[in-house]
């Protein structure tokens, strides 16, 4: 089999299994069903992945890489608070659109069911959020008393909770929930006149892209004189 065909087959296996994991979870997926769905033999499946856990590790690794890319602090450092808000929306958008990310998020929560040792993909995300919060504090966009580690923990826990709850709700509501979260969180995070002469407010902008609706919270600055 040519290398390109082998790559395509491997990707088909990953994508089909990710869709199944995202819908039914680790315990609810039988690889025999995936093999049948794809029209492959068991031998073909195990040529690429020796076990179910190998597939899990592949999916979680891809999800972790996606989280790191979407929330990478250096790329967002020009305006760290805005970058933090926009990157959280990007994570939610990716979760809604990308079956591998949806499966990765679910499997991260079910790691205790997996015999292989799998790192928590949310840890890199958490570190990136902390870095953006530190940068926002240096830029006096948030209060000097903010504990970056605790706020990063809170943000990640809230977003992960939204992802888990989405299994019982329509996915479109996740963006609305995220906007509500930031509306409440920024009240406690942002600097007040006593901290800096600049007042900052946040507004939500809504843009449409085809049939999908993308919401991004954009930080705007108003300078009081």
Language model features with spans:
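Basic, helix-initiating cap at the start of DNA-binding domains
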Residues: 1-24, 28-40, 53-57
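Short, charged helix-capping/linker segments at alpha-helix termini
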Residues: 27-28, 142-146
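Key DNA-contact positions within bacterial/archaeal DNA-binding proteins
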Residues: 43
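A short His-aromatic
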Residues: 46-49, 53
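Hydrophobic alpha-helical connector segments
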Residues: 58, 69-101, 148, 152
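Short, basic, alpha-helical segments at the C-terminal edge of helix-turn-helix-like DNA-binding modules
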Residues: 61-67
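C-terminal peripheral helix-coil segments that are non-catalytic and often amphipathic
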Residues: 82, 94, 123-127, 131-138, ...
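Short secondary-structure transition hinges
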Residues: 89-141, 164
């Amino acid at each position: 089999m040519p290398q390109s065909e082998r790559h395509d087959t491997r990707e088909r296996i990953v994508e089909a299994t990710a869709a199944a994991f995202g819908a039914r979870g680790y315990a609810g997926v039988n690889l025999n069903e995936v093999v049948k769905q794809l029209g492959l033999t068991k031998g073909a499946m195990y040529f690429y992945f020796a076990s179910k856990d190998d597939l899990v590790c592949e999916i979680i690794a891809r999800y972790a890489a996606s989280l790191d890319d979407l929330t990478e602090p250096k790329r967002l450092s020009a305006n760290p608070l805005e970058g933090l808000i926009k990157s959280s929306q990007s994570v939610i958008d990716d979760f809604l659109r990308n079956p591998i990310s949806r499966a990765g998020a679910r499997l991260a929560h079910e790691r205790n069911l997996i015999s292989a040792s799998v790192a928590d993909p949310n840890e890199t995300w958490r570190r990136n959020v902390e870095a953006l919060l530190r940068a926002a504090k240096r830029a006096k966009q948030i209060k000097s008393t903010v504990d970056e580690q605790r706020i990063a923990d809170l943000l990640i826990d809230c977003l992960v909770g939204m992802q888990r709850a989405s299994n019982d709700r329509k996915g479109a509501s996740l963006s609305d929930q995220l906007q509500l979260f930031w509306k409440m969180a920024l009240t406690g995070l942002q600097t007040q006149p006593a901290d800096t002469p600049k007042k900052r407010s946040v507004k939500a902008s809504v843009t449409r892209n085809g049939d999908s609706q993308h919401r991004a919270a954009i930080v705007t600055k108003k300078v009081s004189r």
